[in-house]
Amino acid sequence: MLNFFAAAPKGFEYSLAQELTEFGATEIKESVAGVYFTAPLTLAYRITLWTRLASRIVLVIYKGSCESAEQLYNAAYCIDWPAHFSNRNTFSIDFHGTGGFINNTQFGALKIKDAIVDRFRDDGDERPNVSRTDADFKVDAHFRNGVITIAMNFSGPSLHQRGYRSTTGEAPLKENLAANMLVRSGWQAAPTTLLDPFCGSGTVLIEAALMAADIAPGLQRNRFGFEHWRRHDKAVWQDIVAEAKARASLGVKRCEIKFYGSDIDSRLVALAKRNAENAGVLELIEFKVANALNIEPPAAEGYLITNPPYGERLGNVSELLQLYYQLGDKFKKEFGGWKVAMLCSDIELISSLKLKADKQMKMFNGALECAFNLYTLHANSTRRDTPVLPEGVDIADIAPAFANRIKKNAKQLEKWAQKEGIDSYRIYDADIPEYNVAVDKYLDYVIVQEYMAPATIPEAVTKRRLSDVLLALPAAIGINPNKIIMKTRERQKGTSQYQKLDERKLELITTEYGAKFKLNLTGYLDTGLFLDHRLTRRLVGQKAKGRRVLNLFSYTGSASVHAALGGAKSVTTVDMSNTYIAWAKDNFALNGLQGKQYEFVQADCLQWIRDCNEQFDLIFIDPPTFSNSKRMEDSFDVQRDHVNLLSALVKLLSPTGELVFSNNKRKFKMDIETLTKMNITVKNIDDITLPMDYKRNPHIHNTWLITHA
């Protein structure tokens, strides 16, 4: 009897142990990401050819305690390597695990390599050569908890590589994962009609057809690890392969199970057909191009087993939530009598099916932890009478309080926005505490920003509420799900800075009181336009005529544009970011503003103030609540530093000049007493700078008009 270890993804251990038991292996012991077993050589060959779940099978040659580099070397040296492979063969060592005296896997591999080479030399042979890639004989070593296991890679390249896949589609499913889905769903034990409406490159259906047709999954592989092993019995192996080929030929002819696959992507369906043909099961599977929401049950009962798209694969989160919700509705209405098994990495997506799972399991798709849920759809008992809206959501079913509130807000604000001459505005701002999001409308797009929930609320609850928001939105305000953009932010507590999200750009042009501004809805946490400062910008424009205007911490220069359009004599725009200065220039160009009177300065604003000798008639400053940028010499805290900041700015203000000061610190307290002693007059103007769409959140910012006393 020989000792083996069958490696597999985490979560496969139980299924793999059952499979090995059915093969006739003995001394089966589950471990982490694999199963130990013993078997004679003939059975080991059969297992290697027929296993549908294992990723790799290794023949254990040595296993024992190891507490030093010397012990590791001796353990490897004591193995009779010339009895396992010829010095004419190349070899490689795959070492896993660190700890104790092994700081890195390369060190462990090197020690074993030295021992192997020395053993050949000491036995009077020339040393074999090491090949880092495509070696003839592969040594597999594992070090864990002071125990070293040295083995031979018996199976060769990963066993999930069956040999039938031509190329992969987007986010391919590994073959042994598909096989495990079929096993754990119960389908393999009682094969019946099988449907996969998101078939992709056909992996689930092909693996199922291989099972039903009694085709060995390794039959098309052209390489195995034992081929250069000196104890390999070629005749026995060839007999096992010949038997498998005979069974496959007979199995395809006898198979009466029906398989149906569809995908919305015609290229993937074509690929699935090629893969099925390569696997020898194309005649058993009916493929077609179709939207999963339009499929019909091909039989009165059967299994629907699928791996639909999720965040790591495809699509916008709102679109995916809609898709899952509509799928759940379709299953309830049309698939009574069927069983459904679904793999998904996002618990909120799979929860959006609104189906009660019979069983919930975990599986790993590579490193990605996924939920694998099983459902039984009882005929007629779970059908929903209310039709699904075109957007996929019945408002009465999902977050009704949120849906009704935002629907009401949107209706009221749309008329107001048209009258105001704006097309970007806020339609919801955590009006209902349970739905702790802000929803901003930018032309025909919507951005949903999630505020950080209190620590007392479980994460699962906040995720579910956010999913409900994204599900309810399309029907509530009449927007296409693919035009909903999701962002996450905290309520500003002083440390929030502008944050870049990704390289993709979704740029729009918005209009505000006659001014045009460029928006980037996806590149940054903020879009390029602070909507709550809309009236403040207009105020700057109204006060700008004939004046020298300074805009500090200018961001994308929107207040500068209003000043220029308002007839300012000159406009100086200062920001530390090259990106925002370039953006400000773009905004000026959009509005046809050009000339030497418009100056753009990239600089540390605080240092620029200290160095400036000019006078201005109107200054607008909207500093960050807190900043510790690497480009700044010192940190800045608006509460701590506002007196020094304003006193320095007043020195730049002409005798009749005005300073508009705004910030977003929620509990900001203006030190009026100290400023008054400095002959500075301060007046709060929140009442005229808070837009209607922010009336529900009056603490979004605070704004002050400051002059010489």
Curated annotation (Swiss-Prot):
Alphabetically list the UniProt keywords. Cytoplasm, Methyltransferase, RNA-binding, rRNA processing, S-adenosyl-L-methionine, Transferase
Q: Which Gene3D superfamilies match?
A: 3.30.2130.30, RNA methyltransferase domain (HRMD) like, Vaccinia Virus protein VP39
EC number(s) reported in the record: 2.1.1.173, 2.1.1.264
Q: Where is the THUMP domain?
A: 43-154
Kindly list the GO molecular function terms attached to this UniProt entry: 23S rRNA (guanine(2445)-N(2))-methyltransferase activity; RNA binding; rRNA (guanine-N7-)-methyltransferase activity
Kindly report the protein's main subcellular placement as a broad class.
cytoplasm
One GO cellular-component annotation of the UniProt record comes to: cytoplasm
Subcellular location(s) per record: Cytoplasm
**Catalysed reaction, written as an equation:** guanosine(2445) in 23S rRNA + S-adenosyl-L-methionine = N(2)-methylguanosine(2445) in 23S rRNA + S-adenosyl-L-homocysteine + H(+); guanosine(2069) in 23S rRNA + S-adenosyl-L-methionine = N(2)-methylguanosine(2069) in 23S rRNA + S-adenosyl-L-homocysteine + H(+)
Please state which protein family the record places this protein in.
Belongs to the methyltransferase superfamily. RlmKL family.
Identify the PANTHER family for this entry: RIBOSOMAL RNA LARGE SUBUNIT METHYLTRANSFERASE K/L, RIBOSOMAL RNA LARGE SUBUNIT METHYLTRANSFERASE K_L
Q: What does this protein do?
A: Specifically methylates the guanine in position 2445 (m2G2445) and the guanine in position 2069 (m7G2069) of 23S rRNA.
Any idea what this protein is called?
Answer: Ribosomal RNA large subunit methyltransferase K/L
- Source species: Shewanella sp. (strain W3-18-1)
Taxonomic path? Bacteria, Pseudomonadati, Pseudomonadota, Gammaproteobacteria, Alteromonadales
